[in-house]
Amino acid sequence: MHCRIFTLADQIAFAELSGDNNPLHVDPVVARRSLFGQPIAHGVHTLMWALDEWLEGRTAPVRFKQLRVAFLKQIGLNQEVRFNLVSQQNNRVRIDVIKENEVAVRMVFEWLADEASYRGNVSPDLPEQQPPDLLGEEEIRRSHGFLDLYLQPETARRLFPNLARFLSPVQSAVLLGMTRLVGVKCPGLQSIFSELNLTADAADDGQRIKYAVAEFDERYGLVLLTVAAPRLRGTIRAFIRPPPQAQASFENLKPLVGDAAFAEQRALVIGGSRGLGEVTAKLLAAAGAHVQLTYRMGKSDAERIVGEIIEGGGQASLCELDILRPDWSGLTLPTHLYYFASPLISGSAKADFSSALFHAFCDYYVNGFAAIVELFQKKGLRNVFYPSTVFIDEMPANFLEYAMAKQAGEMLCQAFEKKYPQMRFYCPRLPKMATDQTVSFHQVQNPDPVPILLTALQNFGDSIVSR
């Protein structure tokens, strides 16, 4: 069985070969704020790996007469995928790349023996690493241009040994150019590759990739490009990803609360560098609390939030903390604990229960939470805010593991209250709100978290226990 796990090192190596250094694929800190919540493998990286697997055992060079590829599911780093040769009749081949029993990439192609009569103008250098373009809507509509072809032989042989031996170098360079086009040029920074269709065209003997936007539907973020390359012609279908969800500024939140409503609190906000934790930290600081917020990866986001609070007259500090491998030494003793630590909230495939996913949620919502409560209750912590979810009541099929883990967290809070009668735990079941965790390609208007969290914090304040 041909299986593969794409690592961050693999992604960086492919970015060097292709020139597609889009942070969605190579920067875990930036990618954590995408709708995927983590870096994902380049679609073309997966395509070229599958083609390399297919070419294993070949003895003669080939080239594509036609190639159709659909990138159906994102592939996260360290997720196992499987090569599946679905059919091979004469010179027509269909291959699927399978992730968690679903087709992630589907390719259908026709091939010919490569007579080696055309080699084109392919540079043997690595392409220059350029920052991906961030294009506005009108810039996308007008986008067109040319891309040079690159194929660095040593790197290509290391990453794709069979492709380097048996696929036309021009066609390998074209595939690499297609991912650079989408990830760096158009749509660029916020892109996601959806489909690639190429057909042999003997009349086109150009030396570069020529591209132009043929259609742009801003309602869905759909971009259709026409492409022409040496002896190839076709189309690319790509989408524009929604940007990270921005939250209300500290200055805009200050008028919503009394400036001394939470003045007695030394608030520790676990997971305060974005989303609900960010809003909570700002609301608490606006109401007079001294806030310490933690981050795991998003140091720059945490620094921005703390700077915003201090500049606005509030009190705030930050501390790095990985709740799964905690170093508690940088935390100050809180009077109030607000627990927003969370992994990527993803649903299970086809609504099938996933024990691994359930335990991954429990690591955050139960085990990590229990550890920090036990640590600070010994030092006098009395008040704990544990955000739960309405999914416990609604039980959506694809999020059973998430709801179960949150309900286990609620039960843990109840057990702690019995074990430690001096403590109070508040577990509001919050609705889905506008955060990085809930952005999607579909234009869904999730509610603003500010009024919902403000009400929850006020209710929590009414039930707190004095020291």
Where are these regions (language model features)?
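C-terminal helical subdomain
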Residues: 240-242, 427-431, 435-467
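Conserved glycine-rich cofactor-binding loop
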Residues: 273-274
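Rossmann-fold cofactor-recognition segment
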Residues: 309-326
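Active-site helix/loop of acyl-thioester processing domains in fatty-acid/polyketide metabolism
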Residues: 21, 32, 39-63, 155-197
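Catalytic loop of short-chain dehydrogenase/reductase
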Residues: 254, 342-420, 429-436, 442
